[in-house]
Amino acid sequence: DGAVLAMVGGTDYVRSSYNRATEAVRQPGSAWKLFVYLAALEAGYVPDDRVVDEPVQFGDWRPRNSNGRFAGEIDLRTAFAYSINTVAAQLGNEVGFGTVASMARRFGITTPVSTYPSMVLGTSEVRLIDMTRAFAAVGAGGRSVEPYGITKVTDRDGEVLYQHDARQAYQQGPDYVAG
């Protein structure tokens, strides 16, 4: 439901109140491929679709796999499980880099997202809390999840001063995409 059980935003709040979990931006790397595959599924791909892991080029950019090898023909499920860079690049190109960026925004990414081809490999900087929100939404069957840290505040007499009110979750993608 979005409850944050623990968060470490820094090592010493007195020295620096900057919360790296909610404020800092970092490149998410392969975790970003979630949005590439969600966009592909929404565009009609299915996990058993066959794709080819092979050298590809988009303009001057030639993505490589981390192991330096290519697997040839594989299914999408395997490409996602093994985080195959060339397949993610091909999917992003086919569905559109703007479509991938839109999917990321639908799942809670609030930072600006580039639409350059390399974005499919996580080169756009994002906040950790946004990535957490997105992955939680997938775990919730595609329903939005808003992170929160305080559930209730009472006074010494037990009177409720604040009670977290869960917002109505909305569907961020079709049921078959995240479900």
Predicted regions and their residues:
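Mid-domain, small-residue-enriched loop/turn segments at the edges of structured enzyme/sensor domains
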Residues: R62-N65, G96-R133
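A penicillin-recognizing enzyme superfamily signal
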Residues: V4-M7, D12-Y18, W32, T78, ...
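Structural recognition of the beta-strand scaffold that forms the well-ordered cores
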Residues: L5-M7, R50-V52, T78, Q90, ...
